[in-house]
Amino acid sequence: GAKAVKWSCEGNPEYTLEETEKAERGTDIIMYISEEEKDFLEDSKVNELLTKYCKFLPIEIISGKKKEWKDGEYKDTTEDNVINDTNPAWTRKPTDLTEEDYEKFYRELYPMAQDPLFHIHLNVDYPFNLTGILYFPKIDNKFEIQKNKIQLYSNQVYVTDSVEGIVPEYLTLLHGVIDSPDIPLNVSRSYLQSDRNVKKISSHITKKVADSLSDIF
């Protein structure tokens, strides 16, 4: 069979690859944490980061066992603690979802928010790839307008909640999720605004919102 490979890196752009011995198939990831970063070894910190960045990853992630309150303390059960939802609402077809499904997903994202006025399900695979669900929030006054409520994902991995340059400024009051592998990451806002796919995505979102508002009013 194929030889096992060991990848090593000391936290800089350089790395080494070498053949090694491994008894079982699969990938082991071993990280060494410095004394100053020991808080990253705490279960609560690990689960916090996994939940933030991998909450909707398409591959099941297990972090220890679920806990239950017993005899005055939390104790591990025999049930795996699954961090993520591998099949979130925005990855499914609109025809497979009910209004209750959309409401449940909104509550999962924003448990303290009022019910939204309406939602828009994005599902495009040409000429760019874009999926997502956007919600138009209920706003009682101008002081309740909150931005940075749209979460950007790339293949179900969380990237950021700062979508300026992708979503028009006047639509950043929307809530929800957009997922696209065609949006370049780690680039400047000006570069984003000049990217052809980003321009198309921005125009598509604007049109979908305008169409929904037109249907209502």
Spell out what each predicted region is.
Residues D43-I62, E164-N186:
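Hydrophobic/aromatic-rich, well-ordered segments within soluble, folded domains that form packed cores
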Residues S44, D71-I178:
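GHKL/Histidine-kinase-like ATPase module
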Residues G1-G72, N81-V82, S154-V157:
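GHKL-type ATPase core
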Residues Y32, L49-Y53, F105-L109, L173, ...:
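Generic, well-ordered alpha-helical scaffold segments in large soluble proteins
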Residues L185-F217:
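Extended, well-ordered alpha-helical scaffold/bundle regions in very large, multi-domain proteins
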Residues S34-E36, W69, A89-P94, H121-N123, ...:
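Conserved short loop/turn motifs at secondary-structure junctions
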Residues E35, D140-K142, P184:
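Short loop/turn segments at secondary-structure transitions that flank enzyme active sites
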